[in-house]
Amino acid sequence: MKIEGVIMDYKESLLLPKTDFPMRGNLPQNEPIKYKQWDEQKVYEKMKQNRVGCESFTLHDGPPYANGNIHIGHALNKILKDIINKFHYFEGKSIRYVPGWDCHGLPIEQKVEEKIGSEKKKILPKSKLRQLCRDHAAKFVDIQRTEFKQLGVIADWENPYLTMDFKFEANIYRELCAIAKQGLLIQRSKPVYWSWAAQTALAEAEVEYEDKTSPSIYVAFKHESIDASIIIWTTTPWTLPANTGISLNGEEEYVKTSDKFIVAKKLYNALIENEVIKGEIVETINPKDLENTNAINPLNGRPSKIVLGEHVMMDSGSGAVHTAPGHGEDDYKIGLVYGLDVIMPVDAFGKYDETIVREKLFRDTEKYLGLNVFKANDLILEELGDALLKRVDIRHSYPHCWRTHTPIIFRATKQWFISIDDAYGKENKTLRENALNVVENLTFYPEWGRNRLKAMLEGRPDWCISRQRDWGVPIAFFRNKKTDEIVFDEKVLNYTAMIFEQFGCDAWYDMEISELLYPGSGLNPDDLEKTTDILDVWFDSGSTQNAVLRSRNYDAGTFPADMYLEGSDQHRGWFQSSLLTTLASSEIAPYKSILTHGFTVDEKGEKMSKSKGNVVAPDKVLKEYGSEILRLWVAMSDYQSDLKISDNILKQNSELYRKIRNTARFLLANVSDLEEIVSVDKMGPLDKWVLSKAKKVFDEIEAAFYAYEFSKGLNKLNNFLVVDLSGIYLDVCKDRLYCDDKKDIHRLASQSAMALIAKKLISTMAPILTYTMDELLEFAPEILKDCCDDIFDYKKVVLPEVESAIDETVLLSAKEKFSEIKDSLSKEKVIKSTLELIIYTNSQEILALDEVESSDWFLVSSVTNNKQNSDILGSFQIDGKDFEVYKASAHKCPRCWKFTAVKEETLCSRCEKVLE
C-alpha cells in the first residue's frame, strides 16, 4: 500500500479546522444587509437598555452643515466619534449619542437664491424664502443621515437635533436672552469683517486666509506746521479716503531727513534700501512732540490727527500707520482714545456710497460713487500724484469670506456683540478670563490643543453675532422708536421664546408686534419696532449644549459633556462658540475634554480638490472596499496630524483587515468543538507563554485606546497577531490540534488559550470592526458567544493573569538560529519538511518543556538531550549551550507525518493510541 493512499485513509481521522465563517468579507455587498438588520433591531435602543445604571459617557456631536453630500472629512469625523463611543460602550459604560445638523446660514440661503433667482428672492415674502431654506436643509439632513449610517455609525438617528426645529430655535433665543441678562450683549458701531459679496458681517471663524495681490504703497502726508511730510505705508489704498489719523509709536525715535520726510529711526535704513527716501538724517524727533498735531491727507486735503499707539510695529513699513477707525480694529480702538471721526464711506456691497460726496472724501467724487473699493485702488494711486512715493505689488495672505471666497473688508456698522472684556457674574470676571481659566482645567487630545485654544482666546476681539441675512434665528428684540432703547423685560423675552417654540421663529416675520408682545407688558405696540438682524450660525451651534444637553428635549446624556470631538479648525469655531455661549449665559464649561483631528489629504500630503483629481469620495470607498476598511483607515491613522488617504493606503488597510479576519477565522475554526475552557494551571508552558504575551499586549492596547491612540494600539495588535500568534503559536499548535485526541489535555489547553485570545480580540476590535465582529459571532461556537445574540450583547473580556516559566529570549533565539539552518537545508534540497529533523540540545530552558512542547516549538519530530550517531546537518550555540540538527532516524507516520514511527508505513505510538 502506498503512503499517499494511507494519507487519504487517515485524513478523516484528523481534527481539521471547521467553520462556515467566510474567508472573504465581501464587505460592499454584505455590510448594507447587516446595517439594515441593526436598524430593524434598534441596536441603539438595545445598547441603552444593556447599560442601564452604568457609568455614563457623553460625546456631544458637533453639527455638520445640512448642505451637500458628505465628504471624506465628514466620514473621518463620524467614524472616530463612533469608535470612541463604542469603545466606552464595550468597556461597560452607558453611552448617549444624539447626532445633529446645522441648518441655518448663508450657504443654504445662497443655494435657494440660485434655484429661484435673485430677482424673485427680492419680492418673495421672508417666511416663504425661509420655508424654501428649511426644505433644502431637511432634504440634505436625510441624505447625510443615510450616508453616515452606511459608515456603520450607531446613533439616535430617529431623534437627531436640527437647529431649525421650533424648540431648538426657541432655546437658541433663550440662550441669547440669558447672555443679555448677564449684561454681555451690546450693540454698537464697530469695524467688523464684512463680506461684500454676501452682504453680511462675519465672525472670526467665518474668515479664511488666501493669497491675494495688493499694492504696497508709501504715501507722504504733509505736516501742517513742520516743513516735512510723514510717510505712511498701507496695502489698502481704498481705505485712504476714510483716514482720520496717523499712528506713531510713542516709545520709538523718529527722524527727519534732508529730503523732508519723517520716518521711524529703526526703519530708516530699510526705506533707503527700498528707495522710498534718499535724504540723510538731519534731526531726531520725539513722537510725543507730534501728538495731536495734524498732517494733510493728499487725497482730499482733510486733516489727519497724529496719535500714539502701541500697535505700531517696527518690523516693516515706515513707523507711521495710516489710521481709518471705520476700517480696522486697532484703528477703531486708538480712535476711541483720541476721539477720531469714524467715517464709513462703503456700503454693504463694497461700493463707495453718498458719504464720499457728503464728507468730500475725493476731489472728484463722481468717478468713485458706486465703484467697488478694490477696483478703486488704481484710480486712487493715480490721484495721489507726487504724494505716492513708492508702489510695489505684493502677494500676501489676506482674509477672505469662507463661503464666497472673495476678499473681505473691515467695515464699521451697527452690530450686536458679546463682550469679551466686560466683567460679569458671581466672580465679577470677564468672559475672556473665565474662558482662559476653564481651558487650564480641561483635558486635551492632543495636549497642544490647549495652547492653541488659549492663544485664540487671548487674541480674539468681541464676538460679532449679528448677520444681515434672512435664514437664521432672528435677534428678536423690540426697540423703542423714540428712545432707540431695546426692551429687555424678562416676561417679554420669555413670551417671544414661547411663541418661537410653538410656531418657529418665522413668527417674528409673520406676526404683528401686537401679537408678539407679552400682553401684560404695559408697552404700546405702536411705540415699538422689530430688530431685523439674525444670529451668526456659530451662535446656533454654540447653543447646542443648552438646546440638546440641558433642555430635556433629547435623551442626549450628561452635562457637561465628557467630550467634544472635531477637526482642528474648530479651535476657532465650535469649541470657542460653545465655550463662550455657555460661560456667558451660565458660567459653566460645556465640556470636560476636547479631542481634535487633522484634515484629510492625499498620499502626497496635498489638499484634495476636484481640479487636482485627488478627491477620495466616501461612497466610492464603500462601493470598492466597504466601510470596515474606511473605519480601519481612521483607526490606523495618527489623527493628531493630517490624515493621508489614497487607493494605495486603502489597499494597505485591506491587507491588514485580511490578516485580522483570517486570524480570527483560524481561531474560530480550531475551537469549534471546544466545550469548556480549561484552567490555566492545566495548560502547558507554550499556552501560558502566549497567554502571558496576549495579556501584556492587550493591556497595552487598552491603555492606548483609553488615551484615544488607536493607531498605537492597533500597531501593537498587528505585531502580536503576525509575530507571536500566527507566526509562532498557531503554527506550533497545529500538530496537537489536528492529530491529538479530541480530549487530550495538550489540545484542550491550546484550544482554551486560543478561545480566550479570540474572545479578547472580538471585544477589542468590536468598536472598530463592528460589522466583522458581529458577523464572526454569527458563526462562532457557543464557547465564544457567551449566550450573546449579537456583538452589542458582548461584554468586555479580561484575560487571566498568567506567569510564563519560559525564557522567551532563549526560545526565540534558538528558533531563529534553527530557521536559518532549515532554510539552508531546504534550499539545498536536503529536506522537504522540518519534520524530517530532530534537534539535540543540552539547554535546560528547552529541555524544561515536555517532549511535545519542545518538538512543536521547532516544528521538528523530536528534541532530545541524547547525542546522535548520524551526521550533524547544522549546529549553533545559545548562551553557551549546544544545539545540533540531525536527520530523524525513525520512520514517517502516515497520519501526523512526524518521523516517529518505529516501522515504515505504520502509525507512531501517539496516532495509534488516538485511533484506538
Segments (PLM) and residue ranges:
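C-terminal low-complexity, glycine/proline- and small-hydrophobic-enriched intrinsically disordered tails
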Residues: 651, 779-916
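NTP-handling and nucleic-acid-processing catalytic cores
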Residues: 20, 24-37, 154, 166-349, ...
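Core structural elements
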Residues: 148, 171, 463, 655-668, ...
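N-terminal, positively charged nucleic-acid-binding surface of large information/translation enzymes
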Residues: 3-254, 260, 324-337, 341-356, ...
